[in-house]
Amino acid sequence: MKLPIYLDYSATTPVDPRVAQKMSECLLMDGNFGNPASRSHVFGWKAEEAVENARRQVAELVNADPREIVWTSGATESDNLAIKGVAHFYSGKGKHIITSKIEHKAVLDTCRQLEREGFEVTYLEPGEDGLITPAMVEAALRDDTILVSVMHVNNEIGTINDIAAIGELTRSRGVLFHVDAAQSTGKVEIDLDKLKVDLMSFSAHKTYGPKGIGALYVRRKPRVRIEGQMHGGGHERGMRSGTLATHQIVGMGEAFRIAREEMAQESAHVLALRDRFFAQIDGLEELYINGSMTSRVPHNLNVSFNYVEGESLIMALKDLAVSSGSACTSASLEPSYVLRALGRNDELAHSSIRFTFGRFTTEEEIDYAAQKVVEAVSKLRELSPLWDMYKEGVDLSQVEWQAH
């Protein structure tokens, strides 16, 4: 077993060796290195063929038409393109957008930017289970609402929103529906033929593909229009200009092909690992699971250890690669805005750790990690005067702390 142990699969995944092999065939002089937009020679034709094959592979995972897949640089760009693209195109119809407080920053900050441009955004608050319900969305809908953006799987707590029910609601009201699915490909079944979803963002690097490539699903029937945000040569039917990176795209296609074929067995494998891990740490007192355990992907376990500071716990677990909050915001020492939105107090939000498991995690690693967590939590609590007070029966919420 190699140390450190990687348990941060929701931050990124390693590229699957089969994906790396396909990518390496699109780089060198004797490989498929051409520009897919070069129409006058065989190098361009071959590259275009590889790109279209990958487009089909991505579409097949989510049961979409390949013509509905637009290549982007990742889910952040896809979120920006979907939300700004719809807002700018349909602003004559209305200027109201609905999203939730627990979306990824790529959605929240895009909405903040639109607010500066004069749009109005309603931010829904989840229940303490971390879920956004159709009833919450319905209550926020207005005559001038043009877009609802709700994530499929939350990146911090792994909860799964009922996008099928939300889609039925938005379609019946003539409102476009965007879903950030960066964390759900290869984890949850997605059928865009059945779902009433108009736009969906995808990322390769959360699904054992390379970083720097993603896609946006844009529905054709009923047709969804978006205004391109990247101007240039008019690639991707004008929705996203820029030379297509054949090697990245081929990597994403292969990653999504593997996800489609191996999803069922992989989810079972990961669920068994998570249950094994949780069974070994469940004996710890004052342990709180963040988010619903029933409507949740098997890959995620987000736990708060009361009376332990999350940052010091991460330092104590130097052989484990885990995170507090999402990778994009874990550098800030603010408590997770997702956990705050669930109603967790600052202490519990600060003491949370996200363990995310994946394709290459082994039982041996799980057992080692669980043992280290139990040891570290117990040791840090021994050093904590708050823990002593709690054990003595002091109600810490009633204590008045003296300011110095």
Swiss-Prot record:
Modified residues (N6-(pyridoxal phosphate)lysine): 206
Catalysis: reaction(s): (sulfur carrier)-H + L-cysteine = (sulfur carrier)-SH + L-alanine
InterPro entries: Aminotrans_V_dom (IPR000192), Aminotrans_V_PyrdxlP_BS (IPR020578), Cys_deSase_IscS (IPR010240), Cysteine_dSase (IPR016454), PyrdxlP-dep_Trfase (IPR015424), PyrdxlP-dep_Trfase_major (IPR015421), PyrdxlP-dep_Trfase_small (IPR015422)
Gene Ontology biological process terms in this record: [2Fe-2S] cluster assembly
Pfam assignment, any one: Aminotran_5
Gene3D superfamilies assigned: Aspartate Aminotransferase, domain 1 (3.90.1150.10), Type I PLP-dependent aspartate aminotransferase-like (Major domain) (3.40.640.10)
Swiss-Prot/TrEMBL cofactor(s): pyridoxal 5'-phosphate
Binding, pyridoxal 5'-phosphate: 75-76, 155, 183, 203-205, 243
Pathway entry: Cofactor biosynthesis; iron-sulfur cluster biosynthesis
Enzyme class: transferase
GO MF terms, alphabetically ordered: 2 iron, 2 sulfur cluster binding; cysteine desulfurase activity; metal ion binding; pyridoxal phosphate binding
Superkingdom to which the source organism belongs: Bacteria
Active site per UniProt: 328
GO cellular component: L-cysteine desulfurase complex
Main localization category: cytoplasm
Entry's EC annotation: 2.8.1.7
Record-linked PANTHER family: CYSTEINE DESULFURASE, CYSTEINE DESULFURYLASE FAMILY MEMBER
Function: Master enzyme that delivers sulfur to a number of partners involved in Fe-S cluster assembly, tRNA modification or cofactor biosynthesis. Catalyzes the removal of elemental sulfur atoms from cysteine to produce alanine. Functions as a sulfur delivery protein for Fe-S cluster synthesis onto IscU, an Fe-S scaffold assembly protein, as well as other S acceptor proteins.
HAMAP family: Cys_desulf_IscS
Entry protein name: Cysteine desulfurase IscS
Gene label: iscS
